[in-house]
């Protein structure tokens, strides 16, 4: 797995470096124009095909583990399903997990696509500035925004996990573990902090300049950030404790060992 990730990172780093060196504005389409000028337009098609294969591999990996992961979350009480569905969790195929994940993804995609395409006001998008394409430009920039915030949240988790390991391990097996670990924590913390502070600064500048579109865009951006932080870091233990107390009270109300009150 580590070897595969390393190869993918190397390939995408080479693509990003090529785009930066061959185009004045850093746009991927500019690389295609440069290759056409050099009579290498076919290579741009091959490059797009390889990117599509990489995306298909990511989707395939996601589909392979999402069902089992969802079912493990259901078993631990992190996700809710009807009691009858819990009887099917131990079957070889994770059907319950796939259905649950599919419903969540469809609802989330519809909600976020509607919000991004109808309400988000991005900067000028040269690729979608024609009549009828404004919603698509808004949706693409909003999708990029969601991907950015999700990546920030993932890096925050990685930094917290690494910080927890540094605090828990008293005598590491390798002498360089603490140095490299603290360096990684500092770099992750500073970079993600800059990304999270930027929209607040942009909102202040937009308010000062009385730019309505930028005020709306940055407000939505900050709202999405707050929602993601709440979803990822909100403690679920108080909710579990409250549900458990209600369950105990229901069992006491109908008598001990009451099968009708026992939930799977």
From Swiss-Prot:
One of its GO terms (molecular function) is transmembrane transporter activity. Keywords: Cell membrane, Membrane, Transmembrane, Transmembrane helix. InterPro entries: AA/rel_permease1. Its main location: membrane. Gene3D superfamilies: Amino acid/polyamine transporter I. The chain crosses the membrane at residues 1-21, 43-63, 95-115, 146-166, 181-201, 215-235. One of its GO terms (cellular component) is plasma membrane. It comes from the Bacteria. It is found in: Cell membrane. Coiled coil: none annotated. It is a multi-pass membrane protein. To M.pneumoniae MPN_308 C-terminal region. This is Uncharacterized protein MPN_096. The lineage of its organism: Bacteria, Bacillati, Mycoplasmatota, Mycoplasmoidales, Mycoplasmoidaceae.
């Amino acid at each position: 797995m580590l070897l595969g990730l390393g190869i993918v990172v190397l390939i995408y780093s080479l693509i990003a470096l090529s785009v930066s060196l061959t185009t004045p504005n850093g746009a991927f389409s500019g690389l295609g124009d440069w290759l056409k000028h050099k009579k290498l337009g076919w290579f741009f098609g091959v490059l797009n095909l390889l990117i599509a294969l990489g995306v298909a591999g990511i989707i395939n990996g996601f589909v392979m583990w999402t069902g089992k992961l969802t079912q493990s979350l259901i078993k631990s009480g992190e996700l809710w399903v009807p009691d009858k569905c819990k009887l099917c969790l131990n079957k070889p195929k994770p059907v319950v997990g796939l259905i649950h994940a599919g419903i969540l993804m469809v609802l989330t995609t519809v909600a976020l696509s509607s919000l991004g395409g109808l309400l988000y006001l991005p900067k000028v998008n040269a690729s979608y500035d024609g009549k009828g394409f404004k919603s698509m430009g808004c949706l693409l920039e909003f999708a990029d925004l969601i991907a950015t915030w999700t990546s920030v949240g993932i890096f925050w988790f990685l930094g917290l996990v690494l910080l927890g390991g540094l605090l828990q391990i008293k005598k590491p097996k390798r002498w360089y573990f603490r140095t490299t670990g603290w360096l990684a924590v500092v770099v992750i913390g500073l970079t993600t902090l800059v990304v999270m502070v930027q929209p607040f600064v942009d909102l202040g500048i937009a308010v000062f300049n009385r730019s309505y579109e930028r005020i709306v865009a940055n407000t939505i951006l900050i709202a999405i950030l707050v929602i993601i932080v709440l979803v990822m870091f909100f403690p679920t233990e108080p909710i579990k404790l409250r549900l458990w107390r209600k369950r105990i009270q229901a069992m006491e109300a109908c008598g001990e060992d009451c099968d009708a009150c026992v939930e799977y």
